[in-house]
Amino acid sequence: MLAILMVVSLTACGQESVRTPGGELENGVAAIEDAMTTKPNESSSASTTPIDDLRNGSSTDTVATPGDFPDAYNFGSGKISDYSRTAMLQKMPEPAGNNTVLNTAADPANIQVLYLWEEGNVPARTKFTQDMTGYFDDWNFRPYVTAIPVREGVKPKGAVVLMAGGAYQFRGNYTDSLPTAAALRELGFQTFIVDYRLSPYTQEEGALDVARAVRFVRKNAEVYGIDPDDIAVMGFSAGGIQAGELLMHYDEDVTGEALDDSYIPDELDEIPAHASAAGLIYSFYGRLSVGNMDPNWLAEGNLPPTYYVYGTEDPFYRQFQQQYEVISGMGIPTGRIVLNGWPHGFGSDGGWVKDYAAWLETIFTENKG
C-alpha cells in the first residue's frame, strides 16, 4: 500500500527511490492505517466529482476464506470492516525445503509454494547483510510464489499474478492479495501471489521477482490449463507500483543480468515475462506515493490494457484520476471502478472483483482477435 507518511526518501518520478534504514516498519503500518480512515486533504470533496464509473461499494459479494483452504491461509471475512493489524502483517507460509520454480513440477490441483530463484543465484544490487535489522524480512529472505488453482473441474479463464501492498515495508497478503486470489479463483482464474522483495531492496529488484513469477506461469501454461498469453499482473498500492515497474522496465526479455552482472541465467529466463493486462488497485504507474503523468514516459512501457480501482476517500484519489485520464487518452484500453466514500486499503472488498474478472475475460478474448 502507499503511505501518507514518507517511509522512503522520494526522488523525481522515474528515478530510483532511496530507502530509509531499518526500523520504519511501524511508521509504514501507521501511515497505511491512517490512509484507510483519512479523507483527502483537499478543499472540495472528491466524492462530488462526476464520474461515469462511480458506484457505492458493497460487501455483499465479498468472498470469505474458502472452506477448502488450509488454516494457514485463513484471511477471515475479506471485509474492510473486519480489518486488523495482525492480519495485515501476517506472513504467508514459505516453501518446504528448497522447492523452487525450477526443481519442482507445477501442481494444478493444490496450493503450492515455491521459491522463485535458485539458492545462491538471486539477482540483486542491494547488499542486505545479517547485521541489518528492523525490516519485515530477514536478511536471507528468498522471494517466493504461492499458486492457488481453480477448483477441481473448473475450466480456467486465465491467470492472475498478484502483489500485495505495504509501502515496501511489508506485504499485506492477508488483507490484499489472498482475499482477492480467493475471489478470482471462484470466478475461474488461476492465481499466483508473489512475495517480492521489500526494503532495503529497490523497486527494480522486486520487479525481477514479479517477472520470474510470470515466466513460471507461462512455462506451465499447459499444466494450468490456460493460454500462455492469458496472464495478467495486478497489485495493490505499492504492489501495483511493483506490477507497473515490471511492465515499464522488466518484462519480456529483460532478465536478472540487467541489475546484477553476477547473475547466471537459467532455462526460465528464455521465456518472455509477458503480461497481457494490468490491474492497479488503489495504485498507479510510478513510484511510491508519486504517480507518473508523463505520456511520453508511459509510452516507453508499451503498456497493456489497464484496470483501475480506487475510492473517493483515498488520499491519492486525484493522482488515480489524473493517470487514468492520461492512460485512456493515450489510446490504451482501460477499465475503472471508483467506490464512492471508500478509503485506501479495502482489498477485495467493495464489490469490484467480479467486474474486473469480466473485463479480464474480455481482454483475453479480444487479444485472440
Spell out what each predicted region is:
Residues 10-12:
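C-terminal motif of bacterial Sec signal peptides marking the signal peptidase cleavage site
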Residues 156-165:
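Short beta-strand element of the alpha/beta-hydrolase
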Residues 172-174, 179, 194-226, 346-351:
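Catalytic nucleophile-loop/oxyanion-hole region of alpha/beta-hydrolase
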Residues 286-287, 312-317:
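Acidic catalytic loop of the alpha/beta-hydrolase fold
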